[in-house]
């Protein structure tokens, strides 16, 4: 069944199959059915310390409810040392939909599930070699470059590196940048970048760009569990104490994010531990810009995180309330996690201006929002700070 599932992943149709925890990756089969796979060692110069193995593809179909168009990432494996096995992190990661409601109440656009927009072209001007860029196709750019400081202490410093895959959805007057980052330390980031011309004929209408990501996470296999992480602290408490909670989620559900409680999702596998005996995990954490995450009349926007059982027919963000109906179990199951990022766009003069004939000229600069998948106790210690015992 592994051969079949790898083929399906490469052609853009997600279909996860049971794989035992710690099962060795069959590299020949992986390469056969994912010939465009990227192997990226870090650091880029000198002996490898960590390695990513990333399958990716493009979908440009006519039914983004069942198989959303755009850049599709997965399956993805990570190796935390040259002697360690490749561990599967996720099976299929993509944007499920872009929902764009305007403040007057209309229009309310679903840019993938209704309009089926696809990736636009990119050139060497988008993806210059001077920033580590290389065109993978006419729609997808790869960049490998410095990511800034990894750490700095009293006696030393180290800079990090990252691999970036990105494309941009051509949504009529807008471009939605789909940017996925794979850092040397095992962290994954997903970003929405919104840029383009304001709504023709109503350029000054305030609106929100929402991206809803669907992440079929498979941490060391498909038997995963999720917990809701949150921070509790009463600023009126003179003792100054605080509490962090990890609330196991037994059934499919959604919950919101708060800047005060630092809400996040923890994903674990019951048999996957590091050498110190600690349960390894990935934390899904918001990367919020612009002050917050919006909610709208539509029920699927009322939560920022969702956890659902894996179902190959469930890709539509707007159907999330249906996917959690009946409270199907999600503990020790094949899981899909969802996250909604929001950009509140209040038009400004920098977006453009009207000329004497009232024609609009200008382009809104890129605004960003996204998420992070952060490894937690995945490593035994940091291999980037020597010595690592």
Region roles according to the model:
Residues 1-10:
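Bacterial N-terminal signal peptides
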Residues 12-16:
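Sec/Tat signal peptide C-region and signal peptidase I cleavage site
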């Amino acid at each position: 069944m592994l051969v079949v599932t790898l083929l399906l992943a490469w052609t853009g149709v997600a279909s996860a199959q049971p794989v035992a925890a710690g099962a060795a990756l069959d590299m020949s089969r992986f390469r056969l059915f994912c010939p465009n796979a990227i192997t990226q060692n870090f650091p880029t110069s000198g002996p490898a310390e960590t390695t990513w193995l990333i399958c990716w593809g493009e979908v440009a179909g006519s039914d983004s409810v069942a198989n959303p168009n755009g850049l599709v990432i997965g399956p993805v494996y990570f190796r935390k040392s040259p002697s360690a096995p490749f561990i599967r992190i996720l099976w299929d990661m993509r944007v499920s939909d872009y929902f764009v409601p305007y403040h007057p109440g209309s229009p309310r656009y679903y840019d993938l599930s209704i309009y089926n927009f696809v990736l636009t072209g990119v050139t060497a001007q988008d993806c210059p070699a001077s920033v580590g860029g290389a065109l993978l196709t006419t729609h997808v750019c790869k960049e490998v470059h410095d990511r800034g400081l990894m750490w700095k202490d009293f006696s030393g410093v180290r800079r990090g590196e990252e691999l970036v895959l990105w494309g941009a959805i051509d949504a009529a007057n807008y471009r939605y940048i789909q940017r996925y980052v794979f850092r040397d330390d095992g962290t994954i980031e997903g970003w929405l970048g919104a840029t383009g011309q304001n709504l023709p004929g109503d350029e000054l209408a305030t609106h929100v760009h929402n991206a809803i990501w669907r992440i079929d996470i498979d941490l060391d296999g498909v038997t995963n569990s999720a917990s809701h992480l949150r921070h509790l602290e009463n600023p009126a408490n003179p003792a100054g104490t605080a509490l962090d909670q990890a609330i196991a989620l037994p059934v499919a559900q959604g919950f919101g994010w708060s800047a005060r409680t630092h809400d996040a999702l923890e994903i674990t596998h019951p048999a996957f531990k590091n050498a110190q005996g600690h349960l390894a995990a990935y934390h899904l954490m918001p990367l919020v810009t612009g002050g917050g995450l919006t909610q709208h009349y539509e029920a699927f926007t009322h939560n920022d995180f969702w956890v659902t059982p894996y179902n190959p027919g469930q890709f539509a963000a707007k159907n999330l309330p249906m996917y959690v109906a009946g409270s199907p179990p999600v503990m020790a199951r094949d899981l899909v996690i969802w996250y909604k990022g929001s950009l509140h766009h209040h038009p400004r003069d920098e977006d453009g201006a009207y000329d004497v004939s009232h024609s609009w000229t200008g382009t809104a600069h890129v605004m960003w929002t996204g998420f992070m998948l952060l490894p937690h106790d995945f490593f035994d210690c940091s291999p980037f700070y020597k010595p690592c015992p």
